[in-house]
Amino acid sequence: MKDKIIDNAITLFSEKGYDGTTLDDIAKSVNIKKASLYYHFDSKKSIYEQSVKCCFDYLNNIIMMNQNKSNYSIDALYQFLFEFIFDIEERYIRMYVQLSNTPEEFSGNIYGQIQDLNQSLSKEIAKFYDESKIKMTKEDFQNLILLFLESWYLKASFSQKFGAVEESKSQFKDEVYSLLNIFLKK
């Protein structure tokens, strides 16, 4: 039941944020009474913290899965970027975007988790860097790709909400090829 509570809470927090989600909402989503939540968690805060942890674990797992299958070519970079934006469950993208509105009491912990995720992502992106094929420094390459991903996370959260995912995939394809053409040596 604890896992089901967290699973449903992730969806609720991703849609309504921390302040907009009540314990009643969470209890109703798993068909239990609000008082029964306290058997599993001592507060809404602890449910939220566990939900955030699961979100970051999920995103880190995507990075780890890429490490197991990537040949670190430019084509593999395109595939990784595409999967990191469009093959991730919508609620995790929206939860990640919602973290910018998290109450102050969580900010230190969440900021640390964001830094850890960005560090893992940056290390993974660095593996795609090939000096013989890319005409910018490794650091500039990493920063550009991270900036691209962050902007697309915002776009993806809105396109999923408004049902324009396929249109966004086409736009993404065009933009990522433009981006790759900017830094690839000819």
Curated annotation (Swiss-Prot):
Domain HTH tetR-type: 1-59
UniProt cross-references to PROSITE patterns, sorted A to Z: HTH_TETR_2
Keyword DNA-binding recorded: yes
Residue ranges: DNA binding: 22-41
InterPro entries hit by this protein: Homeodomain-like_sf, HTH-type_Tx_Regulator, HTH_TetR, IcaR_C
Additional facts recorded: Binding to the ica operator DNA involves two IcaR dimers and is highly cooperative.
Quaternary structure note: Homodimer.
Functional note: Represses transcription of the icaADBC operon necessary for biofilm production.
Protein name: Biofilm operon icaADBC HTH-type negative transcriptional regulator IcaR
Natural source organism: Staphylococcus aureus (strain COL)
